[in-house]
Amino acid sequence: MIAVIHSFDSLILGGGAAGLMCAIEAGKRGRRVAVLERADRLGKKILISGGGRCNFTNIHCQPENFLSANPHFAKSALARYTPGDFIALVEKHRIPYHEKTLGQLFCDGSAREILQMLEQECSSAGVSVFLNTKINEVSRSPEFAVHTANAEFHAPALVVATGGLSIPKIGATSFGYDLARQFGLKIRDPGPGLVPVVLDEEDRSRYCDLAGVSADVIASCNGQQFREKMLITHRGLSGPAILQISSYWKKPHAIRIDIAPDKRLTSIFRDPKTPRTLAVLRSEFRKTLPLRLADRWLDLHVLASWTNSALEDLEHQVHAWAIAPAGTEGYEKAEVTAGGVVTDELSAKTMESRKVPGLFFIGEVVDVTGQLGGYNFQWAWASGAAAGRAM
């Protein structure tokens, strides 16, 4: 059987957030663009994001909100496609939205509205979309040729927007990294990011029967700290504070957790008239911490004496609880993939490979990982726009 040959100006592999934005920008410039998506529909990760409401950007987005071996790489793209630019697009389509917390913007309704907006913009820009398209091979001589079971797609520009390894149940694979290596680009070892951590057997026995208990904490590791909610799970720790710090944590290091920020739980004992008893101490802990966590903490951290020094040691432990996770919940529970195509291989302005003209990498496949709260979508929009405007 002779394969059907399709010719375009630009081929975009992956119909997620970055790929669709790239297609829109390139199509608006008159380029003949094709998006090749292996799934049966576009934007599956968009649809499940933000609890189904899509945390589509963060109004406080800065380069400092991203983790990369080169912290300066993201600056150019983020400056040229800002949260305000995406908000303008959302407002153009009259999609109601709200700020939830810390600058995080969500749809009032459904994430489906964001996907429909992107699909409409693609249609207006003349973008061709091919679903259920499994790629067998990619070659270059001198144009790029993408081979599928029954067709070939040719173009002078190829954009890899295939995402990372997180959430394999919706189709995540190593395809983008494999393709980068095929063309001689280096990869920074990928790993799960924004992911719950798993405790070792000893710590699980101490804390995990408290699954469902949450508290406002400060989680710190590797020079970073985040003040948000922590959630105890059946296997370890989760919640925004833990997801945030997980991207900066590496085994065997510890994560330090302040379980009572801005509080001194033993300060009541400065008054010499206060009885130094467990009942008084437990009452103070319960005023700040969830009851079950307060009681468990005191059961596990028994005072050897009621001296000022012993109370100070207990206070220190409250504000510097050191947990050395056994690992993470892996890509199945990770919101993003850290690591990826080394940024030194790419132009910060266009996302084009320095070694292979016409080859672009955008979105999660690149070694740029945003913090929790809409930053990874903003990187998808910004890197996609940068490549789309360069082709």
Predicted features by range, described:
Residues 6-8, 149-157, 225-227:
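Core beta-strand elements of the Rossmann-like FAD/NAD(P) dinucleotide-binding domain
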Residues 8-35, 387-391:
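N-terminal Rossmann-like FAD-binding beta1-loop-alpha1 element of flavoenzymes
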Residues 11-13, 36, 135, 153-169, ...:
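Short hydrophobic core segments
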Residues 27-51:
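Glycine-rich FAD pyrophosphate-binding loop
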Residues 40-42, 47-48, 56-63, 96, ...:
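An anion/pyrophosphate-binding glycine-rich loop and adjacent beta-alpha core
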Residues 51-101:
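Glycine-rich active-site loop/strand segments that organize a redox cofactor
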Residues 80-157:
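Feature captures the FAD/FMN-dependent oxidoreductase FAD-binding
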Residues 130-131, 295-369:
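A glycine-rich dinucleotide-binding beta-alpha-beta segment and adjacent secondary-structure elements
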